[in-house]
């Protein structure tokens, strides 16, 4: 809503985009080649155990690779609606956060993530590995590493490695597009975990 008002007040008009060409490129990339590699991508609320259930009860996952919303990022779904639409999501933006991880406090946020990790653990093989890309946003007074470590405690996963993954590059930070003073992106981390 803010961005739309900003453009209208200034009489700005976006450059024309051939939406069908964008869709065609995506379709060719997604459906143009097949691979012997198998895997599953889920678009669901992973706090719900049934969201992660495999096709058959005996199937177990070997890898979980994820990047959950960062603490305080309440507009995660609306900000990603176009990407979501390309993979089958709704064709309109829904400005609500009712189906998102709780952001009321760092403790509540970590507890919600812990439920996700427990649900993932319950459908993984004994030697499964999980990799989490996690960071923070600058206006939150919570340490991303403390949050992710807290979320993984008593979750069925044990942290084996934490690596700095750098920061989001300035050119890719949509939050800075209309700001006079650019914010400094926080360091992101790759957290590796295994089942104990």
Give the label of every model feature segment:
Residues 1-66, 71-72:
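SAM-dependent nucleic-acid methyltransferase catalytic core
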Residues 141, 145, 149, 156-196:
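Class I S-adenosyl-L-methionine
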Residues 51-63, 69-129:
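SAM-dependent methyltransferase catalytic-core segment centered on the flexible catalytic loop
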Residues 20-23, 113-115, 145:
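Well-ordered, non-membrane alpha-helical segments in soluble/globular domains
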Residues 63-64, 85-89, 152-155, 183-184:
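Short, surface-exposed linear patches
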């Amino acid at each position: 809503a803010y961005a739309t008002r900003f453009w209208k007040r200034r009489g700005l008009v976006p450059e024309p985009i051939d939406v069908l060409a964008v869709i065609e490129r995506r379709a060719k990339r997604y459906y143009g080649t097949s691979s012997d590699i198998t895997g599953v991508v889920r678009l669901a609320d992973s706090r719900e155990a049934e969201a992660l259930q495999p096709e058959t009860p005996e199937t177990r996952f070997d890898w979980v690779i994820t990047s959950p919303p960062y603490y305080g990022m309440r507009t995660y779904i609306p900000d990603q609606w176009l990407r979501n639409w390309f993979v089958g999501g709704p064709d309109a933006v829904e400005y609500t956060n009712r189906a998102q991880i709780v952001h009321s406090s760092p403790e509540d946020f970590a507890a919600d993530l812990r439920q996700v990790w427990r649900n993932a653990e319950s459908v993984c093989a004994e030697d499964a590995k999980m990799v989490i890309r996690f960071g923070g946003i600058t206006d939150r007074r919570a340490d991303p590493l403390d949050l992710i470590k807290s979320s993984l405690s008593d979750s069925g996963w044990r942290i084996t490695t934490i690596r700095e993954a750098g920061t989001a590059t300035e050119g890719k930070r949509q939050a800075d597009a209309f700001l006079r003073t650019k914010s400094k992106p926080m360091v992101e981390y790759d957290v590796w975990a295994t089942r104990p």
